[in-house]
């Protein structure tokens, strides 16, 4: 552990790799064909964090929290230390109720911060602010709201308002996610088909889809046309957010919308994200290994921007007291296999020159009534706030050697 701690700074960034310009903020840079994050001190940074850092709500969560911590500062100080001792140095999406506590911790402990990557829900917030309904009455069509009156102007107001005020110009904020898993299409439902099926012919989403088809001179939706239209929708979404960001804090990294499922394989969507996002975030499930020669190569070609794995995990089913009936992560027999899967998957990510890191989903296991009473073994921590020993050991071995492994892969 000492060797690792001496080779990284407070952000977990390398102090031995060539230093870059220090701007006081995180930014991205491509060096010799590999994408990097550069931290506020100018050190090259590989992102390794955990999502959903928040207090558990079950009775045993509360009992354990009170026994082990008792105060927010002890909780976060202990958590920061324990995570950094296994090579995790920050937080990701869904830290509901904790972001302000993390910032308070960071202000009191400037030498041992937890980075933040707060997540928002722009589309649903826009819908509520404007008292709109979802296009066609379905939240599957939420992306169609970008065609509704006021989208661009609302993004500017939202980013300039109270929701973002605490994060602007904070050096410990890696960046932000504007939404989660927007349904630009799925295996069973193409966005162009959905919009064309809206019964209200004056609905702006329907109007946009109809105009697109008219411009193509056809009434038959194909996968290629759907991909092109999805890209148009995505570009209208991302452009509004990015232009609003530039007006309030042009150094705040825009981490995209955590593409998942079908959208992450759609050229039109990824190209649009690459045009306006600083980092393309990917919730990476349904694969045991990163798709180095296919999807990951495509992302590099389509976007010319780095990607961040914003979610991945496996759950152990034989040695967990949870029913494990929820979640997109693969099931494995035990905690041992969770550990092996972590190393296997992240080794593949280290090999990818367009990957700038990952966020494990998530900080702590589900419990109690989580996920409609279908809790699952997703956490680095169990429900008593104890790190899973085998998973944390194997994660530490990989995380501590990550910078050396990158140099090995880049030879």
Predicted regions and their residues:
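Polysaccharide-binding and catalytic clefts of secreted carbohydrate-active enzymes
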Residues: 40, 139-146, 166-268
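Loop/turn elements at helix/coil->beta-strand transitions in domains of secreted/extracellular proteins
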Residues: 33-34, 43, 84-93, 109-117, ...
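Aromatic-rich peripheral "rim/lid" segments of glycoside hydrolase catalytic domains that contact
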Residues: 193-202, 361-411
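Active-site-adjacent substrate/metal-binding segments within catalytic domains
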Residues: 1-110, 125-175, 220, 224-232
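Substrate-binding cleft of secreted/luminal carbohydrate-active enzymes
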Residues: 92, 173-175, 180, 310-312, ...
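Glycoside hydrolase catalytic-domain groove-lining segments
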Residues: 218, 228-243, 247-327, 347
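Active-site clefts of carbohydrate-active enzymes
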Residues: 128-144, 221-223, 261, 266-267, ...
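Short, acidic/polar
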Residues: 72-83, 156-162, 262-273, 291-293, ...
